[in-house]
Amino acid sequence: MDMRTKLMAVVAGAAMAFGGTAAAQGTPAPGKVAATKAPAAATRGKTEVTWWGHAAFVIRSPGGAVIAIDPWLSNPKAPKGAAQPEALDAILLTHGHFDHVGEAKALAEKTGAKVYGSFELINLLGLPEAQSVGANAGGTFQVKDVTFHLVEAVHSSSYAADPKSPAQYAGAPVGYVLEIDKGPTLYHAGDTGPFEGMSLIATQFKPSVALLPIGGHFTMGPAEAAQAVRLLKVKSVIPMHYGTFPLLQGTPDALTGELKKLRNTAKVVVPEPGATTAL
């Protein structure tokens, strides 16, 4: 049994532990998107960040852009019965692993949104050309009042259309910096460990909020994430990619403790899955 198959088995077990299968929780199985009421528009003048558990976020800008990042919206931590977005302007993928691609194809088909990611991954998804934007670190794009940049990440990336298919190389992983007009600059790190290039991200883009993995094992844990906060010089951090599987043991409390050791005053913002944070 390869690691991908093992993780899929862990997902099934985790779903049962959280009260049944994904379908029983009111969220669709991977590749399926429930038809639900559209989410409310962003509060006037605010950027709204909704965490769907794991590394999945939906971001609404003051100018009306609605952007999903790594939309595994049926993950075991996903909010029960929450309305999935009916309208999206863009879907951003950090890499090809199933727990990040999630329902990207189904959401793209449903909403008509363009899907952005590494060139190889986008080719593997097989979406219509008009919705496929393959790029790489250094690429810059604009959607309404949001300018976003693909940046480096330190991880691996492969993609399989389903658990029974062999995984294929899906290009280099990336993170995203989102510069929001009349709003904050956000950094979604994707899956990564800390790296010196985070200092360049701080210098070039000056993000104020970082969405960082803290679970460990496949990404950085709390101690490494605290070092990333130091390199990025952000004022706030929203932890992600923790608690979804038993292997992801890092916690927000541990991150807070590690930041205190560094005498770093960045605020740790810990939303519940499904909760929206206004920035």
UniProtKB/Swiss-Prot annotation:
Keywords: Hydrolase. It comes from Myxococcus xanthus (strain DK1622). NCBIfam families: PRK00685.1. This is UPF0173 metal-dependent hydrolase MXAN_1394. GO terms for molecular function: hydrolase activity. The lineage of its organism: Bacteria, Pseudomonadati, Myxococcota, Myxococcia, Myxococcales. The keyword Hydrolase applies. The keyword Transmembrane does not apply. Belongs to the UPF0173 family.
